[in-house]
Amino acid sequence: MSEIRTGIVAAARWGIRNEPRIHYGAVRPIPLGRELPLTTDCSGFATLCYYLAGARDPNGRGYDGYGWTGSLLERMENVDRRAVLPGDLVVWGEYPGHHCAVVLEPGDDPLLASHGQERGPLAIRFSDESRYQPADVTWLSSLP
C-alpha cells in the first residue's frame, strides 16, 4: 500500500479514536488540522484525512476549504467496487451525493470510517452503513 494511502487510513483512524471530540456540522471552510475539538461534515472529514496524509485535494480545489460531496463526485474517478483500495471513498446517493466515507479495509464488505450526523467518526462495515443510506453507491479514487 502506498505511503499516501497508509496516511489517509491513519488519519481516519485518528478521527475514530477522537470521536467524542469531533462533531458534525457543515462548516466551511473545512478545518484542516488536528486541533480538537473539531466540527466538520462527512466530506470535510474525508478531505481532512487526505490533507493530513499529504495527498492532493480530492475536491480539486487546492485545499481552499470549500469542497463538498458533489465536488468529490466531480473530481475523483469512479472505480469498480472490486478494485477499491484503502483510502478510496464511497458516496451514497446520486449527484450531488448524500453521504461519503473513507475505505479503511477493502473486501467483500469493506470497513469504512464514516462521520455522520448521529455521531463522530466510527468504523463501520459497508453493509451496515448502507442500511441508512440511499441505494445508489459510487466508489471513488484519485490515488495511484
What are these regions (language model features)?
Residues 1-10, 62-79, 94-144:
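Aromatic- and glycine-rich peptidoglycan recognition patches
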Residues 1-61, 113:
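N-terminal capping segments
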Residues 86-87:
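Loop/turn positions that initiate beta-strands
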